[in-house]
Amino acid sequence: MSTISRQQYADLFGPTTGDKIRLGDTSLFVSIEKDLRTYGDEAVYGGGKTLRDGMGMDNELTSIGGAPDLLITNVTIIDAVLGVIKADVGIKDGRICGIGKAGNPSTMPGVTPSLAVGPATDAISGEHLILTAGGIDAHVHMISPQQAEAALSNGITTLFGGGLGPTDGTNGTTITSGTWNLEMMMRSFDALPINVGLLGKGNSSGMKPIVEQIEAGAAGLKVHEDWGSTVGAIRTSLEAADEYDVQVAIHTDTLNEGGFVENTIAAFDGRTIHTYHTEGAGGGHAPDIIRVASYSNVLPSSTNPTLPFGINSQAELFDMTMVCHNLNPKVATDVAFAESRVRPETIAAENVLHDMGVISIISSDSQAMGRVGESWARSIQTADAMKQGRGKLPEDNADDDNFRVLRYVAKITINPAIAQGISHLVGSVEVGKFADLVLWEPAFFGAKPKFVIKGGMIAWSLMGDPNASLPTPQPVIYRPMYGAFASALHKTCITFASQAGVANGIAERYGLQRLVEPVRNTRAITKNDMVRNAHTPHIEVNPETFAVMVDGVHATVAPIRSVSLGQLYFFS
């Protein structure tokens, strides 16, 4: 048997078990935990390589016979469910069909049956790439359709939220109010190459206005303080959600007019709810909304403008709040409202609670204090900042950061998918799931993806001058690919809706051409279902200093002065 050095092997086939990969310019390193391929029989595309007729490709295998449509070879997978592994990944009919060893079973041992390669199979060389699930942003103000382009450019493939363009209501709240608006927004998203789920308005003490939105296809409900986050509205929306199996997201009452955090928690009555702005900087009971993160029925999230906590966070947030919530800087009470939300102490605690796995989800709050194209970047930046500010996590090995990285990856992939009832289709790199996948060069991990695959087709990609002699000449920018056009888009993108809406035939009634899939299993889940982010410690907030105590320990970290994945990667 011939042998080669580990360095030569990595040059040819990429890293393998025990090898480490640095993520971008961060201090984070991941180590490959296991390799599912067979050494010496790697499936490699190209001139003189193994995926040729009669070698690594079975010349008798047809598409009908099971050959994958697309194979990603020798790729490093970073996935909150699978861990950090090396494998070939196959896609067929828009779904992940296999993860393991690809090739020709007639000439290669150990080929995974669903990864037998035939003439019908195309290939992406993943030897020096990282594969993740597409990101899921569960807090989107749908202010402009161009958000889809910005989101895809940072590896986000699913948007959950609401709105109907740049209305003041949309600028302030993630809600698509009413049946006609829901229909029109679903019709509009039919042409955008990204998955979507729309949230109806839950701000009603009466049941009928809520029910009609769910039956019109709302994939969830949103209760927002700008429309009145009253105890009555909370209770009614949760009752409707329990009946129809949709999730409720809430932005609580900053001014404590309708009650304090204790009253809101009592209104939850142990029922599952997704709390937006759990840290409070984006809104919610001042100063102690962060306490809800200690309850098992609460699925807590926070948004990317306060992640990671930096020296400019406080100044930036004040102006954001004034603009987004229709406040007047000439009115003293409006200024006081904004100032009550921007508390460096609770922002610092938010970062620590993310690192501890107490806050489970990271989202954007797009164009309404947050940036839809930065959730992956902010997640990895925060992981890096916390490593530098807090040191190694006890769960991590001495020479890698696998647990910490996977904890943060979970916050923007599988956990929002579980919270919104779509994890049976998206959110992880698992066989049978919709092939929403992102490929990254390690040097650009979290900042700039190389390819974004939607439903098995490349929909978004870095691409050079289309008139050039190669794909690589400048200007290399993000461009829509074939998966983002015409009816291919309809077969590779999903509109998520309530089960009641799907049963009511909204696809036909609204003339939707995209896939329409129901959300499910949103009511029986708890914090314990949040992958790698299920911690429920006791949390207290000092009402005078705003210091946050977690199991009696002050949860704080100094604001960072410089950030990874920053100006080295982006002009500013």
Curated annotation (Swiss-Prot):
One Pfam family here: Urease_alpha
Domain Urease: 134-572
Processing after translation: Carboxylation allows a single lysine to coordinate two nickel ions.
Protein's UniProt keywords contain Transferase: no
Keyword annotations from UniProtKB, A to Z: Cytoplasm, Hydrolase, Metal-binding, Nickel
Catalytic reactions of this protein: urea + 2 H2O + H(+) = hydrogencarbonate + 2 NH4(+)
A GO MF term: urease activity
Superkingdom, taxonomy of origin: Bacteria
Modified residues (N6-carboxylysine): K222
Keyword Repeat among record annotations: no
CDD domains hit by this protein: Urease_alpha
Positions with a binding annotation for Ni(2+) 1: H139, H141, K222, D365
Residues binding Ni(2+) 2: K222, H251, H277
Cofactor(s) recorded in Swiss-Prot or TrEMBL: Ni cation
Active-site residues, Swiss-Prot/TrEMBL: H325 (proton donor)
GO BP terms: urea catabolic process
Family as reported in the entry's similarity comment: Belongs to the metallo-dependent hydrolases superfamily. Urease alpha subunit family.
Quaternary structure note: Heterotrimer of UreA (gamma), UreB (beta) and UreC (alpha) subunits. Three heterotrimers associate to form the active enzyme.
Record's protein name: Urease subunit alpha
Gene: ureC
